Swiss-Prot record:
This is Chromosome partition protein Smc. It is found in: Cytoplasm. Contains large globular domains required for ATP hydrolysis at each terminus and a third globular domain forming a flexible SMC hinge near the middle of the molecule. These domains are separated by coiled-coil structures. Belongs to the SMC family.
Length: 1183
């Protein structure tokens, strides 16, 4: 099959009839811009059934009709025909040549013809189904459609794949099957309704027929069954009474036992409370004693420490005294030896002196007095000299002390200076370190603040990314949902529009007339008028038979239509001929609340139908309710019919019609019109939402990418800041440690300075004290030396006198005196030493007594120390013992608490158990009382049934018997009058019911067959689609590799689990680039990808002929040649007709013709290639 020719007449710029022949292979259509080349493509789309004038670059239907030009009248119609070679029977028509025609008149009426025979648009669409040819197929690629393919939604791309898969016819069959299924469902509902109604009638009559016979049987059965039940129940009740009495005693015993246990538990709990209180008191008492013991132990330990210290001091003092006594013993022994020696020497000298005594007595007396004076002076001088020596020694000691202290003072001063230098140096270091630490700390805080801001920003960005992603996902989901809704609504709208176009829902006669093609038919009344929805019921109730009247131009057209119906035996219908209608308008002048007006005034339509509206609706008044209608009728205020908003009709003669019907045909047509309007608004709104959502999604995607880039930068910045913070933290810790060390050093140095200053002050005080001592000593020495000097003068005088006497008394005297003096001296010495010895003895005795006393003191202190230690140990032992007692008490208290807790649980459980036991006891008492009452009632009932023979009822069947008894009672109570004639009536109804049931089963079987067919079609659709998808996917990858060099192409099914709503996305991956969606490609890349996609489809299923409008416009020369080479490969399977400006395309074409336009009259013409070349050259020069 191929396209032999296109015939265009009055379509757009083709004001004159043109006939364009096409050959096989590649044909190029060329011409200047604006010459009308693309109108040829629009004509092809239009004849194939394009309903959207926007897609063929027109605003409304009249735009496709030639509008005229200079000295050229406008055309009254536009007509396009496709002449197709069908020798291979590619199309399902038994003709070698097929002619497809579409014609539109200036009135807007469309005509479709196949081989010059009138047809319907649906038949043309069905003819081309699954051929790749059609208004939306891939065989007609208009201007910009290449890029539109790339920018198509996944569902639109899926539709292209479906066309290539050849499943459009299957989808159409499925739609048809679904319609059949819907009709079957309607028929099934009707049959079910009649069947249910028949079943109800049958059941009613059946009950009446059986009623009389059943009544007595049921009554007797009821009495016998009742007595048997009563006897069995009585036996059961008496048995239950005995059993429950036993249970009652058991429950009563259980209550007593539980109460006794509860009482014991409560008693024990009270005892535990008392014991715990005693334990607390005992613990408080022990705590009080322990506190006193701790105080006593503390005091004893302090006292012991003092005693030990005193003991050590006494021992040291005793040791010193004992050493001193030994020293005194040695000294006494020496003194005794000296006394003995002096006494011996005295005795020896005394013998000599006796001899000289007489001679010397006189001299002695003289000299005695002088010697006494001398001795006194000598002793005085000696004592004073000794004092001077002692003072000199003291002075020397003081001087030595000064020298030592001055050295120590100098050393302390040097030490203080050194310490001060160290302190100054340390302070400087600390200050510098603190400055550095503060700097590091400020840097650290700054970086931390920077990190916090960065983290906050990062967190904000992450939250934003999450929110944006959610928003994008939500938008994508919403868009998919909107697209699904839009497709569903559009599909539903198209179906409703097709139903409207096909006049579905009208009476058969009306429908056949409308589809007959008879000229002069305007349409059905209901389709040509408009009114507010609230008047629907009123209009339908008032003129139900007129709404499907057909409006025709004149009575001749009406006659033709009636003849058509008569000839075809298609039924009857009414016609409203515009030339015979006589308006019948009644006026209503009264002003009454609730009157909405004449129906003719409430309806809108074309002015040409005003006569029809006045004729049909001029005598009909619409009011709010029936009260207003009857009031107007009674007052004779209106001579026509009156209808209410709820559909009650009051005729002019007083007949009132009302009620509610099921949905009528008219109502369904009303509903369809409303639904079409609603769906149109919904589709427009959904498309707007899809566009708006896509724009928002794109904006959010850009924002998301910006935020992601910023997050990457922030992550790097965060890592850098954290590293800086870690380094600064280490520096700060190091500096802090250094500051702490320096502070410790400073404190240590300060303490050292303080100690050195104290020593310095102490040494200075000692020096000052020593200077004072030296000064006082020197004064004392000076005073003593003056006294010694005076005494020595006196002593010299005395000695001089003695010397004078001694000279006089010679040597004897001297010897006598010397001996005497020696004896005296010896006696003094002996006396002195004896006194010293006595003093030493006394000192020894004194120190011995002290030693004895100290020994006693030591013994007492040691005893005291031992006593104190004993007391401490004793008190500690008591303290520890009482602590153990406290632990024992704590353990006892814990045990009591644990016991109390367990007993509390037991108490709660016992209380609950006791309460439940009491409840059970009370309930069993109630049960026993109820059983007794039941026994009494049963005995009374049995007394009433004495004469009745009782059925034997087993206990296990008692419940079912009672159910049976209740059923019998209900049946008997429901008995009414018995209709004996109902049996025959029931037989007739049963036969009718069986017939309808068989018919219902046949319809159900048909429904199953249709459903199985739909399932089979679905499976076939799925299988063919996926096979096609896989082949085209492979082909697309191959074509991308061949046409776009080293480029990978892939198709991807979105939402594959939902076949009806799934879509297909196109992805490409250029060499050295990431896989990316087509929206990110350049214009040239998009064109090449689209061409690769189209070629991939051709590889799988080439279209018999293909129109391509400037498909290579965005391609360079190389890619254009590549494209033409691919097209050449398909010329054995497909015919290509290209609209082009490209020279390479023209060169590769098998045939070529041109299109030019006469600008004055605006008519396009077909010209030869040579002429079009000349025109193109002229246009190029002019430009």
């Amino acid at each position: 099959m191929y396209l032999k020719a296109v015939e265009i007449n009055g379509f757009k710029s083709f004001g004159d009839k043109v006939y364009i022949d096409f050959n096989r292979g590649i044909t190029s259509i060329v011409g200047p811009n604006g010459s009308g080349k693309s109108n040829i493509l629009d004509a092809v789309l239009w004849v194939l059934g394009e309903q959207s004038y926007k897609n063929i670059r027109a605003k409304e239907s009249q735009d496709v009709i030639f509008s005229g030009g200079k000295e050229k009248k406008p055309a009254t119609k536009a007509e396009v025909s496709l002449i197709i070679d069908n020798a291979d029977r590619y199309l399902d028509l038994d003709n070698d040549t097929v002619k497809i025609t579409r014609r539109i008149h200036i009135s807007g009426e469309n005509e479709y013809l196949i081989n010059d025979t009138k047809s319907r648009l649906k038949e043309i669409g069905t003819l081309f189904l699954d051929t790749g040819i059609g208004k939306t197929a891939y065989s007609v690629i208009g201007q910009g459609k290449v890029e539109r393919i790339i920018n198509s939604s996944p569902k639109e791309i899926k539709s292209i794949i479906e066309e290539a898969a050849g499943i459009k016819k299957l989808q159409a069959n499925r739609i048809e099957a679904q319609k059949n299924l819907a009709n079957i469902e309607i028929n099934l509902d009707k049959v079910e309704f009649i069947l249910n109604e028949t079943r109800e009638n049958k059941n009613k009559i059946e009950k009446q027929a059986e009623l009389a016979q059943k009544y007595i049987d049921l009554r007797d059965e009821k009495s016998s069954l009742a007595k048997g039940i009563y006897i069995t129940e009585l036996e059961q009740k008496e048995k239950n009474l005995s059993e429950n009495e036993n249970i009652k005693e058991k429950y009563q015993t259980e209550c007593f036992e539980l109460q006794e246990k509860l009482n014991k538990t409560l008693e024990r709990l009270n005892t535990i409370d008392l014991e715990k209180e005693e334990v607390k008191k005992e613990k408080l008492l022990i705590d009080s004693r322990n506190k006193e013991l701790r105080n006593i132990i503390s005091e004893k330990e302090k006292e012991k420490a003092v005693t030990s210290e005193r003991l050590d001091n006494v021992k040291k003092e005793k040791l010193v005294k004992e050493e001193y006594i030994l020293h005194l013993d040695n000294k006494i022994e020496k003194k005794l030896e000296e006394v003995t020696e002096s006494k011996n020497k005295k005795d020896e000298i005394s013998k000599n002196i006796v001899e000289m005594a007489a001679a010397n007595k006189e001299f002695e007396n003289k000299i005695f007095n002088l010697e006494n004076i001398k001795v006194e002076k000598f002793d005085l001088i000696e004592n004073r000299a000794k004092k001077v020596r002692d003072l000199e020694l003291e002075k020397q000691l003081a001087s030595n002390e000064i020298e030592n202290n001055e050295k120590k003072l100098k050393s302390s001063q040097d030490e203080v200076e050194n310490f001060k230098q160290e302190l100054e140096e340390a302070n400087k270091k600390l200050l510098a370190n603190n400055k550095e630490k503060d700097l590091v700390h400020s840097q650290l805080e700054a970086r931390k603040e920077e990190l916090t801001k960065t983290e906050e920003r990062n967190e904000f960005l992450v939250n934003q990314l999450s929110e944006i992603s959610k928003s994008i996902n939500k938008l994508s989901q919403d868009i998919r949902e909107f697209e699904y809704q839009e497709k569903t609504s559009s599909g539903k709208l198209e179906a409703l529009v097709r139903m409207d176009e096909n006049n579905e829902g009208f009476f058969k006669g009306v429908k056949e007339v409308l589809n007959s093609g008879i000229s002069g038919i305007d349409g059905v009344l209901i389709s040509l008028i408009n009114f507010d929805e609230k008047y629907e019921k009123a209009v339908e109730a008032a003129i139900p038979g007129n709404l499907q009247d057909i409006i025709v131009e004149d009575k001749e057209v009406a006659k033709k239509c009636i003849a058509f119906l008569t000839e075809k035996k298609l039924g009857r219908t009414s016609f409203l001929a515009l030339d015979t209608i006589k308006p019948n308008r009644r006026e209503f002048k009264a002003n009454i609340n609730g009157v909405l007006g004449l129906t003719a005034d409430l309806i809108t339509a074309d002015k040409k139908y005003q006569k029809v509206i006045d004729f049909i609706f001029g005598g009909l008044l619409i009011v709010e309710n029936i009260d207003i209608a009857t009031d107007i009728l009674n007052k004779n205020l209106f001579s026509g019919n009156i209808v209410t908003l709820t559909g009650e009709l009051v005729s002019s003669r007083g007949r009132i019609t009302g009620g509610e019907n099921q949905k009528s045909t008219i109502n369904q047509i009303f509903e369809r019109k409303k639904e079409i309007k609603t769906l149109e608004e919904k589709v427009t709104d959904l498309k707007s939402k899809i566009t708006e959502g896509s724009k928002k999604r794109e904006d959010l995607s850009i924002k998301l990418e910006n935020y992601e880039n910023e997050v990457d930068k922030i992550d790097s910045l965060e890592d850098s800041i954290r590293k800086d913070i870690d380094l600064l933290k280490k520096d700060f810790e190091s500096l802090s440690e250094k500051s702490e060390k320096l502070s410790k050093d400073i404190r240590s140095i300060s303490f050292n300075i303080e100690d050195a200053e104290k020593y310095k002050t102490s040494y200075q005080d000692r020096i000052n004290s020593s200077f004072s001592t030296i000064e006082e000593t020197e004064k004392h020495i000076a005073s003593l030396k003056k006294d010694i000097e005076a005494d020595e003068n006196l002593l010299k005088q005395t000695i001089s006198e003695i010397d004078s006497l001694n000279k006089q008394f010679s040597d004897t005297r001297i010897l006598f005196l010397n001996n005497q003096s020696t004896i005296e001296q010896l006696e003094k010495d002996i006396h002195s030493k004896e006194i010293e010895n006595v003093e030493l003895q006394e000192e020894k005795e004194k120190n011995s007594k002290i030693v004895i006393e100290l020994s006693h003191n030591i013994e007492e202190l040691e005893t005291l120390e031992e006593e104190l230690q004993s007391q401490i140990e004793e008190h500690t032992k008591i303290y520890n013992s009482e602590n153990r007692d406290i632990e024992t008490l704590n353990e006892r208290e814990q045990n009591l608490s644990n016991e109390e807790r367990e007993l509390s649980k037991d108490k709660s459980k016992l209380e609950t158990d006791s309460l439940h036991a009491n409840d059970r006891f009370e309930k069993i008492v109630e049960v026993i009382e109820k059983i007794k009452v039941d026994i009494l009632n049963i005995n009374e009932k049995l007394n009433e049934l004495v004469e009745i023979t009782a059925q034997v009822i087993e206990v296990e069947k008692l419940k079912s018997s009672k159910d049976r008894l209740r059923s019998l009672e209900n049946k008997i109570n429901n008995f009414g009058d018995v209709n004996l004639l109902a049996i025959n009536e029931f037989k007739e109804l049963k036969e009718r019911y069986d017939y309808l049931a068989r018919e219902r089963d046949d319809v159900v079987k048909s429904r199953k067959q249709v459903m199985d067919l739909i399932q089979e079609i679905d499976e076939r659709i799925h299988e063919d689609f996926h096979t096609t998808y896989q082949n085209i996917n492979e082909n697309f990858n191959k074509m991308c590799d061949e046409t776009i060099r080293n480029t990978e192409g892939r198709l991807n099914i979105i939402n594959p689990e939902d076949f009806e709503n799934c879509g297909i996305e196109i992805f490409v991956k250029f060499k050295n680039k990431k896989k990316q969606p087509l929206s990110l490609l350049s214009g040239g890349e998009k064109s090449m990808v689209a061409i690769a996609f189209i070629m991939a489809i051709f590889m799988y299923k080439p279209s018999p002929f293909t129109f391509l409008d400037e498909i290579e416009a965005a391609l360079d020369e190389k890619n254009t040649k590549n494209l033409l080479g691919k097209l050449r490969d398909f010329t054995d399977k497909s015919q290509f007709i290209l609209i082009t400006h490209n020279k390479e395309t023209m060169k590769e074409s098998d045939s070529i013709f041109g299109v030019t336009m006469n600008k004055e009259i605006g008519i396009s013409k077909i010209v030869s290639p040579d002429k079009i070349t000349k025109i193109l050259s002229e246009n190029k020069e002019n430009n």
